[in-house]
Amino acid sequence: MKIGFLLCSPEINGGTNVILEHGAGLQAYDHEVSIITERVVDPMEYAWHPKGDQLEWCTFAEAQEEQFDCLFATWWESPYLLHRFDAKQYIYFVQSIESRFFEEDDPTNMDLRDHSIGALRCDHSYFFSLPMITEATWIKQYLEKNCNQQPYLVRNGICKELYSGNSVLSEKPRQGLRVLIEGPVDVFHKNVPGTIALCREAGVKEIWLLTSSSVEGVEGVDRVFSKVPLEQTPPIYRSCHLLVKLSAVEGMFGPPLEMFHCGGTAIVYDVTGHDEYIEHEINGLVVEQDDEAQVVEYLKMLSANPDYLENLCKAAIRTADQWPDWHQSS
């Protein structure tokens, strides 16, 4: 089949990673796959992903000259664009309920004053009469309950071979915690600055930051890894005891699972999607949203109790071993 994925952005982010992995997976099954973007994309923009150069990239204008057997909308604006393209079947791949990504209206701020309009238009996209596929149980249930949809659930895989090594950038300190924080520093619902502050309050020995933001240094962070290619991330994960990921909104977030595959554990908020693989006090620690005092308490407890930390990590490895790879998912 000839399959196309409409893509919002080729930049480093979890959603784009999922789309490129599925595209490469379908191509491995001998389908012809195109990644379709509004503008011409420089290959350097997707060089962060090891499979980016295996796929055909084309613009909206070029794709409008083609006929597809199957065309995927992949973010909230793209269902409104499908009429521009010729396809036998259109599908909406829903990775989150994206209206939750919009900040509240602020009439005094030109950038924020009309966010509710975009959020409403986003919500309307989930009522389109399209077959839907999603990656998380909570999204499937939301679409069933609120939008009268019957989506298929296809959980994200993970690139097992990428995380199969044992190299590190630096051996973990024997005393105290080295914590990894992941996410863009300027996206409000990722809560990276707040996470850094809580780790500092807890007296964490070292804080590392893995970010898609173009930054050389961040206040309160000991070591910053900015725009790192995907294949270079495992040694970063393996060098840290745990990931602290305190997002306010997620679809089915990948970084804790990646940390599990690298021998670590995670502290997360009870954000949507966490329960796909994180079990409280078994393979990680789950904190009620915005309970900052509990986050600090858990960090202090793990620092003082390495045996408990080790037990969480061992269970996280067992969870990782049971998780499907991208070949199975695609």
Task: State the predicted function of each range.
Residues 280-281, 285-291, 301-306:
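Conserved acidic donor-binding segment of nucleotide-sugar-dependent glycosyltransferases
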Residues 99-105, 145, 150, 157-175, ...:
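Acidic anion/phosphate-binding donor-loop and adjacent secondary structure
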Residues 307-330:
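A charged, aromatic-enriched C-terminal amphipathic alpha-helix characteristic of glycosyltransferases
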Residues 142-146, 158-162, 172-217:
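Conserved catalytic-core segment of nucleotide-activated headgroup transferases in glycan assembly
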Residues 248-249:
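Aromatic "clamp/platform" in nucleotide-sugar-dependent glycosyltransferases that forms part
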Residues 265-268:
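Short hydrophobic beta-strand element within catalytic cores of glycosyltransferases
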Residues 61, 98, 105-132, 140, ...:
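Membrane-proximal helix-turn-helix segments that form the acceptor-binding/catalytic region
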Residues 234, 256-261, 275-276, 282:
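Short alpha-helical segment that forms part of, or immediately flanks, the ligand-binding pocket
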